[in-house]
Curated annotation (Swiss-Prot):
Record-level GO BP terms: taurine biosynthetic process
Tissue-level expression: Liver.
Highest taxon in the source lineage: Eukaryota
Protein name in the entry: Flavin-containing monooxygenase 3
Disease link: Trimethylaminuria: Inborn error of metabolism associated with an offensive body odor and caused by deficiency of FMO-mediated N-oxidation of amino-trimethylamine (TMA) derived from foodstuffs. Affected individuals excrete relatively large amounts of TMA in their urine, sweat, and breath, and exhibit a fishy body odor characteristic of the malodorous free amine.
Protein's job: Essential hepatic enzyme that catalyzes the oxygenation of a wide variety of nitrogen- and sulfur-containing compounds including drugs as well as dietary compounds. Plays an important role in the metabolism of trimethylamine (TMA), via the production of trimethylamine N-oxide (TMAO) metabolite. TMA is generated by the action of gut microbiota using dietary precursors such as choline, choline containing compounds, betaine or L-carnitine. By regulating TMAO concentration, FMO3 directly impacts both platelet responsiveness and rate of thrombus formation.
Organism, scientific name: Homo sapiens (Human)
Catalytic activity: trimethylamine + NADPH + O2 = trimethylamine N-oxide + NADP(+) + H2O; N,N-dimethylaniline + NADPH + O2 + H(+) = N,N-dimethylaniline N-oxide + NADP(+) + H2O; hypotaurine + NADPH + O2 + H(+) = taurine + NADP(+) + H2O; (S)-nicotine + NADPH + O2 = trans-(S)-nicotine N(1')-oxide + NADP(+) + H2O
Amino acid sequence: MGKKVAIIGAGVSGLASIRSCLEEGLEPTCFEKSNDIGGLWKFSDHAEEGRASIYKSVFSNSSKEMMCFPDFPFPDDFPNFMHNSKIQEYIIAFAKEKNLLKYIQFKTFVSSVNKHPDFATTGQWDVTTERDGKKESAVFDAVMVCSGHHVYPNLPKESFPGLNHFKGKCFHSRDYKEPGVFNGKRVLVVGLGNSGCDIATELSRTAEQVMISSRSGSWVMSRVWDNGYPWDMLLVTRFGTFLKNNLPTAISDWLYVKQMNARFKHENYGLMPLNGVLRKEPVFNDELPASILCGIVSVKPNVKEFTETSAIFEDGTIFEGIDCVIFATGYSFAYPFLDESIIKSRNNEIILFKGVFPPLLEKSTIAVIGFVQSLGAAIPTVDLQSRWAAQVIKGTCTLPSMEDMMNDINEKMEKKRKWFGKSETIQTDYIVYMDELSSFIGAKPNIPWLFLTDPKLAMEVYFGPCSPYQFRLVGPGQWPGARNAILTQWDRSLKPMQTRVVGRLQKPCFFFHWLKLFAIPILLIAVFLVLT
């Protein structure tokens, strides 16, 4: 057998890692704290310590064609944006199809991962686990950390003077499950992220009054984009990424703001970000603008202080008679089973080469899978990360020197600050990142060659959605069905909506989509050229 690999967590990152290890002839053992797979997507009625937690009404923000495993499309009849139960159903089907369950030890908690005494030469790890009160230790050749980054809630109570005097209920959004207990209540939601907006709009149907407090604002996008197509199938494209990264900054910024304001003017709704040109991940919510218009949700600035029954905002206004405060303030990054010397942090930034490998170890035998965030979906990202990591562990891929890795990290971090802002330390440019990882393992599609040999496919790959299938077209792990999956992705996207057929299916024309978006800039450039 190949090298023994410990995998911590059986969510989508863990399952992708098991599968990638098997593809490379490695011997995986996955440790899962709970009694089931799915991680974040496995709903539970109560938030469990040390596990990700979601509320009952969670739907995906990525559409099914953009968030699947690259060789395992969602069923045709699944909706484009899915309830968490549908995604869990898909995850279970994937695990069974790829025969992954037998490699998982359930109800097993990883208490510590330490360097083996001869780590400098072998790269091995001592992994200690607990099950039914019994501790066991084993030596592994490598470790893949797949425990996610939505586990440990960030609850900055010290940032809110007077909160200790507040007499109502106060808790983090991970403990929120459903709206029933808030009937007739006055609720303040702190934080304008996806969870905060979802919870606020859901509560607005039953609560007496709901307010959202936001320190810096946010762009709010709809899942439904031009002509009713899923947003990511129109916006997450190679051509769009090329334009975004090569247009003059002023034009790129103008187009970005115009695109974000296409549905409604954020200034009018109190949602406008403090720095609107930063490419921070937007919030996806189809109901918030209507809730604000109807007066059942109000947006307020940051909370200056709390009293026993109210919140005083920085603009001097007061929300009185509050029954409950829900902090949708994100999560902290933590790996309590690892020594801090293994995965280092700097200014609240986890230092990882390409978001995967700690750069300062003698041997690169530990990888963090799933510790990035972008406009792209998690599943295809962790699939590529784990494939690369498995090849590095096997020895078929090599990493640069420590110095080169640190230089790359510093350079990328500076770009991230300029592009996404100081607080978005795990944000990344999806297609650029995916191309980078796929190039390491020989799986990056060769676009010029495709235009010469298969122009029909090339047009869809370059101008159409950058779907996960593209990264199983060539190289190790190549999937024979990838070409057909790309050419039929719009059929699968439109299929679940055809419950009342009224005419021929209309697929988008990307030429007119991009022409519409760039019509004004093209006209301005033309006028400038004529005048000069």
